[in-house]
Design a protein with these regions (language model features):
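Consensus positions within tandem repeat domains that build extended binding/scaffold surfaces
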Residues: 1-5, 23-28, 46-49, 68-71, ...
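A structural signal for leucine-rich repeat
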Residues: 5, 73, 95-96, 116-119, ...
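Structural signature of tandem-repeat unit edges
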Residues: 7-21, 31-44, 53-66, 76-89, ...
Length: 149
């Protein structure tokens, strides 16, 4: 927990293959952190793990199952994120505060989606008729449908 919290000089990290969990607030307010290389086998990204970091792209491994509350809160440089299909839980405010985020793509139905996972200005790309679609309708998020495959 808080391993590199507020380490303002940190710009890039290559996480070792044995890392299966990123603890709460591990890279909290690492304002210059632009690049993170996540290992396959990573299961959970903790609460506020990358709060207020500067990543422009986010490539999560397919092994990720849990995005905890505010994991990428105020990551203002992200513009588009496509979530891996094995994510079971997307906790509240995961990508909220990312003012440049335009699209969050969710191509599957997670077991749980928390409130306010994105800002109102962003949209969620999903399949029509999915649980994610229903979540968007109930929460008032703009939806962009993925063409059937």
């Amino acid at each position: 927990k808080d391993a590199f919290s507020e380490c303002v000089e940190l710009k890039e990290i290559l996480l070792p293959p044995k890392v299966t969990e990123i603890e709460d607030r591990a890279f909290y307010r690492c304002k210059d952190l632009k690049s993170v290389h996540f290992p396959e086998g990573l299961k959970r990204i903790g609460r506020e793990a990358f709060y207020f970091c500067s990543m422009e792209t986010l490539k999560l491994p397919e092994s990720v199952e849990i995005l905890d509350e505010k994991a990428f809160f105020k990551c203002t440089w992200l513009t588009e994120v496509c979530l891996p299909v094995h994510i079971r839980r997307i906790e509240k405010w995961v990508f909220h505060g990312g003012n440049r985020l335009k699209v969050l793509e969710i191509r599957h139905d997670p077991e749980y989606i928390g409130e306010w996972i994105i800002n109102r200005a962003a949209r969620i790309r999903c399949y029509q008729g999915s649980k994610v679609d229903k979540y968007c309708q109930e929460s008032g998020f703009t939806v962009e449908y993925i063409d059937g495959e």
